[in-house]
Swiss-Prot record:
Keywords: Cytoplasm, Hydrolase, Pyridine nucleotide biosynthesis, Pyridoxal phosphate. One of its GO terms (cellular component) is cytoplasm. This is Kynureninase 2. The gene is bna5-2. It comes from Aspergillus niger (strain ATCC MYA-4892 / CBS 513.88 / FGSC A1513). Pfam families: KYNU_C.
Length: 463
């Protein structure tokens, strides 16, 4: 494909030169965003002692944003503001907006984060909540949306789901005294393939339509990097009377999303990958507005709302401190909150999101498409397909993938290649038995880094 999303993805012969990569960087309108991050140095990633960043002037090549994003420079500033608030006014931080702080008072802080995240996932602010972590949020959403009956009890899911998703779904099926072997349906690719076609998913939906209560898929498959057609799959599953949920761990802050317009029922994501909010950072969830309504037609003391597991922080602020044990949920996703969220975690999240507030997912996606296409172009050069010591198991179609390319090495190569990359100061992710996952991130990676990575990677393969 020579063009995608209005971006030219065709490269001339001279594109294989270091000078061409540098020319792409010089014309990159997003290049300045790299200065908003602390890129680990080669000396730091090799060191076994705790040290301040910048042990050496030469930065590593960090292509591991699909596992953990690097630290925004704003994080320290936001954390310091939060610690100063706590130390200077104590409990007053819950209700006081301090002049000069980038953060709202604590009781409004989750809304600050949700507002920024809503732009990233294509939702209304009230459809998003900043809370919990990914699997915890999936459990809460499954508790509300998975309502099995004697006839409709199956959940359709990815054949190679991230283990935590698998455990969560399996446990909810068992919680309802059902047999996961009967109620879990795994959708996999054709024999010898890695990509699951949309038509294959449709065929599973049709086959199990009378028995399936839900389909829950990853927006992007973590192992292969495949981006599923969320809009088409959601619409098709709805036509077969299924609830549709999405795990957006690898899609959040990576690709453009329009969860509201696509009529997705629910979704959850982590924020520490492409979102750069820090290890184990607070997650997010989406509940479509149709499921977040609160109906007071029967009276102020008799609200009707979607059944869910409840906690005091999901209660409307107007009644939150009345302590009368009459739960009145916040309309929207906020009503799914359980406990008072960590203001420290929210500071890290808001710091990371402040970077996204300065750009758009459309602009980031345009650069990402070209960055990953350039990576693919350089990787495939100089090899005949039958002699290439690796294959790319990520879809060739740029619209069917995010930033990541998954490189499946021939048997016996992984350990040596991984060691050579590490010695060269390259950080990327390996998955047994033979996959290297490479994810150039548009916020802080460059075309020159892609060029250097490919050269070192190919040298490692030859050794």
């Amino acid at each position: 494909m020579s063009k995608s999303n209005g971006v030219s993805l065709a490269f001339p012969a001279e594109a294989a030169t270091k000078e061409y990569a540098a020319s792409l960087d010089s014309s990159d309108r997003l290049a300045a965003f790299r200065e908003k991050f602390i890129v680990p140095s080669k000396a730091n990633i090799a060191s076994k002692k705790l040290a301040k960043p910048g042990l050496s002037p030469e930065s590593c090549i960090y292509f591991c944003g699909n596992s953990l994003g690097i630290q925004p420079k704003a994080t320290a500033k936001y954390l310091e503001a939060q610690l100063d608030t706590w130390s200077s006014i104590g409990v007053g931080g819950h209700f006081t907006d301090l002049e000069g702080s980038p953060l709202k008072q604590w009781q409004l802080l989750s809304e600050q984060a949700a507002d920024s995240m809503s732009k990233i996932v294509g939702a209304k602010p009230e459809e998003v909540a900043a809370m919990g972590t990914l699997t915890t949020n999936l459990h809460l959403l499954l508790a509300s949306f998975y309502k099995p009956t004697q006839t409709k009890h199956k959940i359709l899911m990815d054949w190679k789901a991230f283990p935590s998703d698998h455990y969560a779904i399996e446990s909810h099926i068992a919680w309802h005294d059902l047999d996961p072997k009967e109620s879990m349906v795994l959708i996999g690719p054709d024999e010898g393939e890695y990509e699951i076609s949309t038509q294959k998913i449709f065929s599973y939906i049709d086959k199990h339509a009378d028995e399936a209560a839900m389909i829950l898929l990853p927006g992007i498959q973590y192992y292969t990097g495949q981006l599923f057609d969320i809009q088409k799959i959601t619409k098709y599953a709805h036509s077969r009377n299924m609830v549709v949920g999405w795990d957006l761990a690898h899609a959040f802050a990576n690709v453009e999303l329009k969860l509201h317009d696509w009529n997705v029922d629910f979704a959850a994501w982590c924020t520490y990958k492409y979102g750069n909010a820090g290890p184990g950072a607070m997650g997010g969830l989406f509940v479509h507005e149709q499921h977040g309504e609160v109906d007071y037609s029967a009276g102020e003391d008799a609200p009707k709302f979607r059944h869910r597991l409840t906690g005091w922080y999901g209660g409307d602020r107007s009644v939150r401190f009345k302590m009368d044990n009459k739960f009145k949920p916040i309309p929207g996703a906020g009503g799914f909150q359980i406990s008072n969220p960590s203001a420290i975690d929210l500071a890290c999240l808001c710091a990371a999101l402040s970077v996204f507030d300065e750009t758009s997912m459309a602009d980031l996606r345009r650069k990402s498409l070209k960055l990953t296409a350039y990576l693919e172009f350089l990787l495939l050069r100089d090899y005949e397909e039958e002699s290439r010591p690796f294959s790319i198991i990520t879809p060739k179609d740029p619209e069917a993938r995010g930033a990541q390319l998954s490189l499946l090495l021939k048997p016996g190569l992984l350990q040596n290649v991984a060691q050579k990359l590490q010695e060269a100061g390259i950080v990327c992710d390996k998955r047994e038995p033979g996959v290297v996952r490479v994810a150039p991130v548009p916020l802080y990676n460059s075309f020159s880094e892609v060029w250097t990575f490919v050269k070192i990677f190919k040298d490692a393969l030859q050794q």
